[in-house]
A protein has these predicted regions:
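Intrinsic disorder/low-complexity segments
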Residues: 2-11, 17-20, 564, 586, ...
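Aromatic (Trp/Tyr) and acidic
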Residues: 22-115, 153-177, 191-231, 275-278, ...
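Helix-terminus loop motifs that line ligand-binding clefts
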Residues: 116-201, 376-387
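Hydrophobic, small-residue-rich alpha-helical packing segments that form membrane-like cores
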Residues: 241-355
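C-terminal beta-rich recognition modules with glycine/proline-rich loops and embedded aromatic residues
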Residues: 365, 434-443, 448, 452-536, ...
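C-terminal beta-strand-rich structural cap/linker in extracellular carbohydrate-active enzymes
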Residues: 544-547, 579-595
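Solvent-exposed beta-strand/loop surfaces of large extracellular or lumenal domains
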Residues: 555-580, 600-606
Length: 715
């Protein structure tokens, strides 16, 4: 049945934004079961995508990911294939793909059981780590005059910094300076480019910089993932040491060569090099990725107390007051900003809080998440138009105005999922987090890899007759090629959360999970996607509480049956159904029934379809829409996406807005009918003479939003 969900713009009180965290401690309430303890099983789209990703990861030549480092540090590059895409020798973002490659190797290793595959993945990580340490050690230069090793602060004194250039000729010269970079610098880009950001040099691949600290973050993240996920002590220890030394280089540079001053105008703030207020507020050039996240994580991993304190201090150096301070007050500072430049900064704020930072960091993350959910999302869970956050509540205006599929950058989905997972740790009883995680995972992330050969999306097309722009066959090709290499080997990372004596089932996936603290192995048996799942103890027994997510879309027929007895006589969608602490044994069978309910996910903004569907006008509010209607004798409409449970159902074969009309019966409750499926894919349905498939299955053009009739009327 179709149920109507009207997402009209609403005013949200500041107090709501300040609640979210269920305790005052920096420690999370729950943690996800480690990636190495959960396996997605069976034959389904999830395992097919995962296996395709692993085959691709193993097919890439590790030497291609080392070329730029060897070149930058004056080492022999013979035998190394030339890198490609954004890692090619003529780009200033080189190294970003190498960082994603290390993360993908580590994630695949943690989620893999096959000994031969694990050995192959491990050998590549060993090669990467050994080579990167060799490069880094070339910066360990003792200066007799200074009586110490050269440090980051010594590189490019201010007079020299003011004269530095960003041309390719200068770039090649700076590559010869590796002995002057300062102890610990590791990057495929010369240190000059981190320094040039202190001079507020703009984004320009020809004459200035791209995003040097973004690249540093990708490398730190890859090394930290190896250190965290790999059980080979020699490799993980070396990876951590490389990351620690680079993190301390960042601390040293920003501690002594930068400052923070928000007073005055932009011109006066830029009169002196190194004002972080301006550095991190620059478009692209000031993009730092998750530097704050990685440095905060490092601060919790290293053994030396002084190093830990410095790394956390360095994390705070990446605060962006222009972006953070309004969010901390509950004000929307999102619109008009580059989406994937800023989502990772918010992830960093939350990790800073977890590492011991102030409560404001938690509030920044929570407020940002709430704003995005209420004001900027598409039905798929993605955000953005041409990589930007546009004005709030204007998704349809942006979608319709876009002439190409420049919507919903895949990196944004990757990072919003990460932020959601991290927030869920602090308030795991709030089902909104895993409802959203399910939405973006099932609709965008799973569908962002071509099902029969490895290629992943950059933008993820949403709109009228929209086709996913397939490409990105390696993590070097683009930012989304990098996150795409990681996405499909970690579907299970947020399936289960645990505390001392409670397990939260956040996702219904065919899986096996080991909860070592309780000495039990849980088995979840279901199809994917699932309308019914059975959870059993495969090994062990124990006393604990189990909480099962009741999805927001489970408005009819939801039930929980323990050993055949129904427990859910009452339930609330978007909540957790709790089975209080009891002794669980291998004889128990827990069945979750959650029939998919069709509903309309309405877009928040009104649009007017003009004659012959050749143009659209967008009204900012109901009054303006009414005036527009009266002047043109037209009715404003609210577009909507047809949902079946958590799945966006995309319409096949619609080419224009005249065809993109979905009529609901007078009672508003028609049901999808199973349709003949010539492609042999499950989940093909018909409604109102149109054919719909789950969007994750789409590999040709489909339409996501339709003109819903029997809905909005202005009176």
């Amino acid at each position: 049945m179709i149920s109507k969900r009207l997402l009209a713009p609403v005013i949200i009180l500041l107090g709501i934004f300040s609640e979210g965290c269920s305790h005052d401690s920096h420690r999370p309430v729950a943690e996800p079961l480690p990636l190495s303890k959960v396996r997605v099983v069976g034959e389904n789209r999830l395992t097919s995508n995962r296996d395709l990703d692993i085959r691709a990861i193993l097919s890439w030549d590790v030497r291609k990911f080392l070329y730029n480092y060897l070149d930058t540090y004056g080492l022999d590059t013979s035998g190394c294939p030339l890198p490609e895409g954004w890692d090619s020798v003529d780009t200033k973002l080189k190294g970003h793909g190498s960082g994603h490659y290390m993360s993908a190797l580590a994630l695949a290793y943690a989620g893999c059981d096959d000994p031969a595959l694990k050995d192959s993945l491990l050998s590549r990580m060993r090669t990467m780590v050994d080579c990167l340490r060799e490069c880094q050690e070339r910066t360990f230069v003792y200066d007799e005059t200074l009586g110490r090793y050269r440090e980051a602060r010594d590189y490019a004194p201010e007079a020299e910094l003011r004269e530095m250039k960003g041309t390719w000729e200068a770039f090649d010269e700076y590559k010869k300076d590796y002995s002057e970079y300062g102890y610990g610098y590791l990057n495929a880009i010369p240190a000059a480019h981190c320094a040039l950001v202190e001079m507020y040099r703009p984004y320009n691949n020809s004459d200035w910089v791209w995003a040097p600290y973004y690249v540093v973050h990708k490398q730190l993240a890859g090394l930290i993932d190896i250190a965290s996920l790999v059980d080979d002590k020699a490799i993980s220890k070396k990876a951590l040491k490389i990351a620690e030394d680079m993190g301390l280089w960042v601390w040293n540079r920003l501690k002594y060569r930068t400052f923070l001053d928000s007073s005055g105008t932009s011109e006066t703030r830029r009169s002196t090099p190194g004002n972080r207020y301006e550095m991190w507020n620059m478009y692209i050039a000031g993009e730092v990725g998750g530097m704050e996240e990685s440095l905060s994580r490092l601060s919790m991993m290293v053994e030396d107390r002084t190093s830990s304190e410095r790394l956390l201090e360095a994390a705070g150096f990446f605060d962006s007051p222009a972006f953070f301070e309004p969010l901390a007050r509950g004000e929307d500072s999102i619109h008009g900003r580059h989406a994937n430049q800023h989502i990772p900064m918010v992830i960093g704020a939350l990790m800073n809080y977890r590492a011991g930072g102030s409560r404001k960091y938690h509030d920044i993350a929570l407020n940002f998440w709430n704003f995005v959910q209420d004001r900027y999302l598409y039905a798929t869970g993605g955000v953005g138009d041409s990589e930007m956050f546009r004005e709030p509540y204007t998704q349809m205006a942006s979608m319709i105005a876009s002439k190409t599929p420049e919507m919903n950058e895949t990196c944004c989905a990757y990072n919003l999922a990460k932020l959601t997972k991290d927030l869920n740790c602090f308030n795991p009883n709030d089902a909104r987090y895993m409802d959203y995680y399910e939405r973006v995972l099932y609709n965008q992330i799973v569908g962002s890899i071509y099902p029969s050969e490895y290629k992943v999306t950059y933008q993820y097309a949403v709109g009228l007759d929209a086709s996913k722009p397939w490409g990105n066959r390696t993590p070097q090709e683009s930012c989304c090629g990098g996150t795409g290499a990681e996405n499909h080997v970690k579907y299970q990372e947020a399936a289960y959360f645990v505390s001392k004596d409670t397990v939260w089932v956040g996702l219904y996936l065919p899986s096996e999970s080991r909860w070592d603290r309780r000495g039990v192995t849980l088995s979840q048996e279901c199809e994917w996607p699932a309308e019914r799942s059975v959870i059993r103890l495969k090994k062990g027994s124990g006393r604990f509480t189990m909480k099962l997510r009741v999805p927001y879309w489970a408005t009819e027929g939801f039930d929980v049956r323990l050993n055949g007895k129904s427990l859910a006589s009452e339930y609330a969608p978007c909540s957790y159904f709790e089975i209080p602490r009891r002794r669980w044994t291998r004889s128990d069978s827990l069945e979750i029934i959650m029939p998919y309910v069709e509903h309309i996910d309405y877009a928040p903004d009104l649009v007017v379809i003009l004659s012959e569907a050749k143009d659209l006008c967008e009204a900012k509010d109901l009054c303006e829409a009414k005036d527009l209607c009266e002047a043109k004798d037209l009715l404003p409409e609210r577009l909507g996406a047809l949902m079946r449970g958590p799945l966006v159902m995309a319409a096949v074969g619609i080419k224009n807005w005249d065809e993109a009309v979905l009529h609901l019966d007078s009672d508003g409750h028609p049901a999808l009918q199973a349709a003949p499926d010539s492609a042999g894919s499950p989940g093909c349905f018909s409604l109102d003479g149109k054919t719909f498939i789950p969007d994750y299955q789409a590999d040709t053009s489909v339409t996501h939003y339709l003109r819903i009739r029997d809905t909005l009327r202005i009176r």
